[in-house]
């Protein structure tokens, strides 16, 4: 018979306070400044993990592209990437920047170049100047002897105009000359690596080798960001762990072609969550395929929510809501939770400027008496709506104290006003701080 000292129950009792660790410290990296006018976004170093996005408009449509960039910036995107693939697109970039400046949108723009970037940056100096950062893909910057020359031309443009670059490797467009050479070298090994390991190594060598070549050409390490994008969760984790171990460059995280809807969100969250928890990653982009007619801003919100739920940054007040069960026969709490979440998101462009700190606020919308009062007390503001068979009243808690009870048909409107009043009362306007 098992003694008390050996029982599972007693072994779970700690005599000393256990160490409950959170995410690991951020990996040390070079800080890369990306600027436009007075707007400075630093990637890496001790800067917060940045959220960026990409337009899906025809860049040659300057007005349409500027409108979408403004939407992404208003949603909280700190950098916005645009495709620069044709002379028409390159010619439109200065007009896009001018439109944004007139609208008061100072978000830095990143030019996404493939195949012909060396020509576009040379032939359209206005484009080269209007962009704040260039994305270069080593896999398609040129083939054979042309590759080094064309890569050098892009790096020289970045140095000339003092622009940051992202050297972005993608396994769908990996440098085939490099991969073939590495496959041959692997075949000559006494104990050849698996094909997957060779692929990982090729991605990493392409990124780091290209970055070191850029440094040789005169670009500072504090002007370079690296990425090695793949579409598999475990592949991304494996590649970035090794990439992060082997270099000090700032790293851009993203699962390429993550997919649509919940699948894309889950895949991106699973991959980035592991890496961010380990302190790897300085900027993220969530590559979601939007549903027809859906706003492009969804990828920004998902990126923000990943960082916020992990406790790495705060972007908007968090709404805590129960999932519902047999005790919550009414849909009122679901509708209220959705309404409050939408309201908070809509207010953030103004609140972010006027009420610093509001992004850390928590609001609880609960559906019955089981967890409702408790969760509501833990939040800054909480409401516990009545469940099935309960008294048709909704107690409201502010900073842990019950302050009033709402009844009737206007619970949603009254609670929204309570939230608004709380924000105005507890988060000082910026002009009052100056």
Curated annotation (Swiss-Prot):
Catalysed reaction(s) here are:
(2E)-4-hydroxy-3-methylbut-2-enyl diphosphate + oxidized [flavodoxin] + H2O + 2 H(+) = 2-C-methyl-D-erythritol 2,4-cyclic diphosphate + reduced [flavodoxin]
Per the record, the pathway is: Isoprenoid biosynthesis; isopentenyl diphosphate biosynthesis via DXP pathway; isopentenyl diphosphate from 1-deoxy-D-xylulose 5-phosphate: step 5/6
Q: Where does [4Fe-4S] cluster bind?
A: 322, 325, 368, 375
InterPro entries named in the record: Dihydropteroate_synth-like_sf, IspG_bac, IspG_bac-typ, NO2/SO3_Rdtase_4Fe4S_sf
| GO terms classed as biological process | isopentenyl diphosphate biosynthetic process, methylerythritol 4-phosphate pathway; terpenoid biosynthetic process
Required co-factors: [4Fe-4S] cluster
Alphabetized, the UniProt keywords read:
4Fe-4S, Iron, Iron-sulfur, Isoprene biosynthesis, Metal-binding, Oxidoreductase
The GO terms describing molecular function are: 4 iron, 4 sulfur cluster binding; 4-hydroxy-3-methylbut-2-en-1-yl diphosphate synthase activity (ferredoxin); 4-hydroxy-3-methylbut-2-enyl-diphosphate synthase activity (flavodoxin); iron ion binding
Skewed-composition ranges (Polar residues): 1-15
Cofactor binding summary note: Binds 1 [4Fe-4S] cluster.
- Please tell me whether the keyword Ligase is annotated for this protein: no
Q: Which Enzyme Commission number(s) are listed?
A: 1.17.7.3
Pfam families assigned to the protein according to its UniProt record, in alphabetical order: GcpE
Disordered: where is this region? 1-24
- Top EC class, one word: oxidoreductase
As for family, the record states: Belongs to the IspG family.
Record function comment:
Converts 2C-methyl-D-erythritol 2,4-cyclodiphosphate (ME-2,4cPP) into 1-hydroxy-2-methyl-2-(E)-butenyl 4-diphosphate.
Name recorded for this polypeptide: 4-hydroxy-3-methylbut-2-en-1-yl diphosphate synthase (flavodoxin)
User: What is the species of this protein?
Assistant: Burkholderia ambifaria (strain MC40-6)
